[in-house]
């Protein structure tokens, strides 16, 4: 079976079930132009709760395997590690049934489940969002300069047994053995300093 180096793998997931002639799955976003995330999806946008950006990125998945039942996503900031000590979770979602996610779909949240982002982390103390509010998109606000954000989408062969408010580790554990393909897209967002 041909392996596609541009496609990410997830620990514990099944091997890709693609034919050698099938094109790899891809993800694109109208909210990321020339590798830069448009300002309205982060701290410089106008949609926020308690100062936390809430307007979610749109995206489109193409060439998903025919066996795909649902999709899952992660939007992560690995550049947050030097600041916080861990990768910042901006958005996790599962059981998406359509390959197109419109702009600000997280606000409605219908037709899929969303997990807790890092804006609900206990170390934020009184500034932390409650689990309900943090179970959505929480946009970019890099405090130490420009960060790179990675949106990864996963094509799955099953609906995952998750409810709103799940955690990233629960998503990864539920996806194990069900990932048919994955695709990633990254973009930069300017810092607040």
Pin down the residues of each PLM region:
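N-terminus-centered regions that define maturation/targeting leaders and the start
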Residues: 1-193
């Amino acid at each position: 079976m041909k392996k596609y180096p541009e496609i990410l793998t997830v620990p514990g997931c099944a091997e890709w079930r693609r034919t050698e002639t099938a094109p790899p799955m891809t993800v694109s976003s109208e909210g990321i132009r020339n590798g830069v995330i448009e300002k309205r999806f982060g701290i410089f946008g106008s949609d926020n709760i308690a100062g936390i950006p809430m307007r979610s990125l749109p995206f489109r998945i193409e060439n998903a395997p025919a066996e795909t039942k649902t999709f899952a996503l992660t939007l992560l900031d690995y550049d947050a590690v030097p600041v916080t000590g861990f990768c910042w979770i901006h958005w996790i979602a599962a059981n998406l049934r359509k390959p197109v996610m419109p702009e600000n779909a997280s606000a409605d949240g219908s037709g899929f489940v969303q997990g807790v982002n890092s804006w609900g982390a206990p170390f934020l103390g009184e500034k932390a969002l409650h689990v309900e509010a943090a179970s959505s998109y929480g946009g970019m606000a890099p405090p130490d300069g420009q960060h790179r954000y990675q949106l990864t989408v996963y094509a799955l062969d099953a609906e995952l047994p998750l409810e709103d408010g799940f955690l990233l580790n629960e998503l990864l554990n539920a996806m194990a053995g069900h990932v048919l393909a994955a695709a990633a897209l990254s973009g930069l967002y300017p810092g607040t300093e």
